[in-house]
Amino acid sequence: MKKPNLFVWLILAGLIKIYTFFLGLKIVKKVNIKGPAIVLGNHNAFMDYMFSTSALYPRRVTYLAAAKMFKEPHRRPFLKLGRAIPKTMFESDLGAIKSTFEILKQQGIVCIYPEGQVSYHGTSLPSPYAIAKLLKKANVPVYVCLIKNAYLFSPPWSKRKFKGRVQVELSQLFDRESLSQLEEAQIYEKVSKAIYFNTGAFNREEKWSYRVQPIQGLEPLLYQCPECLHEGLQAKQNTLACPACQHTLVYDAYGFLNGKSVYEWFQRQQSRLIETIEKTEDYQLSIPVRLVRYVGKGLGEVGQGIFSVTKDKYVYQGTDKGSTKRYEFLTKVVEYLPVDIGKNVQMYYDHEIYIFEMNDPIMTTKMFITGEYYYQLSKTKS
């Protein structure tokens, strides 16, 4: 594994830096980063890699990226040019670890988003504990690239840009000496605290404003009316409206809907679903899906069937490449269920991917809330 080509990096990363400059990116450098080093970032938007690349320029950075992204035609060429390291999500990947250490031995800089996926509601997600083990073993200086309000500028539920301010702050979290003295649990706690960012709480204080755009794409995430509890809010311009009682949430220039952040509304909705799960004996969800897996160098639909979640397991019953299959995944071992809001949920097992595409956008949100709750429930009983 080699660091990114210097010539290619200076050109491509330079173009990214110019692009983000005109977008209004502000960079606050509290440190000068030199390799070998690991940079950790919070992950609230798909554009985060652009913001961190700009902040670290002209330093060459090697990114750890989800292995499935290397199978996506619109992303693969850029990942290859940048010599990114493919990483299987939410399971041990010895190949990715080996490549990471090879870059560090070359005095390189490796950038990791420990959350493993973009935060769909604008507040940092819990990071897998494995990040603490990696940092402890690597024993190189660790820095934080904290990206503020990228969620409001480029929300993951929209293809639109909500023009406004994004700020990146670079700071040091650990040096070699502190890493050698800390236990893994202490490292994990400090990492979690350092990369935590709550968009709503931050902007309630700072009041950075953004150009309001239509918010189509938010309704699969915030699907329930807070007044009558009807499921199926409808997005129109910058509003979410309930077709049953006409209650309307208005998205404003500060990223709030009727004074509350997306995360606050999501938490309320999540709590109501969990309450329903707890009150319903043998609560489960089932939905028709299209199964997508690795096919050659890409991703392709390989079958159709029913995907369900119960207290004990996820089950896919259907076809896969012409054969009838039944795949089971225990909820007690699936801590995180990655989701593309409104599109699919994903399962990673033995370096394979199972993408369950759904026609009902709301079910993607209900499925991951239910599955991850059952995981937490299994831990309290063990």
Language-model features: locations:
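Soluble catalytic domains of membrane acyltransferases
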Residues: 4-5, 12, 18-189, 212, ...
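Phosphoinositide-dependent membrane-docking surfaces
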Residues: 39, 307-342
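A conserved mid-domain beta-alpha-beta active-site/ligand-binding segment of alpha/beta enzyme cores
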Residues: 174, 185-221
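Acidic, Ser/Thr- and proline-rich intrinsically disordered linker/docking segments
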Residues: 329-382
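Structural motif
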Residues: 60, 239, 248, 306, ...
